Amino acid sequence: MALLAFGGKRDARAHARDGSRADDPGESDEAHERDEPSADDADEGEDDSASSDEDETPLLEGPDGGRRKPRGGCPSTMVRAGNFCIDRYEAPNRRGGRPFVMQSANDANEWCQDHHKRLCTEDEWIAACQGEERRTYPYGNEHVDGRCNDDKTWEKVDEALLAKWPSLEAKEHAKELYQATPSGSKRECTSEAGARDMTGNVEEWVVRTRDHANAFPYILIGCYWSGCYGGNKPTCHSTNNAHGPEFRFYETGFRCCRDAAGKK
């Protein structure tokens, strides 16, 4: 599985593809000590977080010297929404990291399982995005320009070149198109639960749990840095059901979920 992320700024170039249609109209900011994946790492198809336990539920030392899990039933790198935990950031789930792209649903499933989590369901993702207030956007019911990374310039992509993935040429083209912002840098693009960048930035794979025009087991949700097809702004219900689990594109990423420990 070749994971693609970038460690530096890229040219502001991207495009929206026809499949990106919208079918349905308490935080800790400590920086992770490890470096984010670099462009060189991406070229080699390496994921320098795959062997890390940073996404495991850490055991904290209590006042009696015993070990306990963090409050809320979720790891410190996740936030709680109802009876489940969801990654605070898009994979690789690091504040200030560059979100993975060119990910298929199969890739996403494998990565989440390797980190002792699972791919979020559609219902979970929407619940974490809209919150108990059932917001249209993670931050409220009215779109605010610049609040999330959803207004980058549209530019045509060479799909035939990307189809050669994981060739060096395909990776270089994906880099040219990459306009995701570092995870968490849009501080106001935060849901009620505390999840960042849920609309815009990279489009995220989830397990389909609702009826759609196509019956693929996975869908993409939240649109990406150039918004949604037709100029629509990404909402907590913006979905793309047009692709099977092997599909990958220059803006496709994901985040992971897991069951929460104990009652909220």
Give, region by region, the residue ranges found by the protein language model.
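A short glycine-rich, aromatic-capped structural motif
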Residues: 59-123, 128-129, 200
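Ser/Thr-rich, Pro/Gly/Ala-heavy low-complexity intrinsically disordered linkers and tails
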Residues: 1-64
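Acidic glycine-/aspartate-rich tracts in secreted/extracellular proteins
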Residues: 90-93, 132-133, 207-211, 260-263
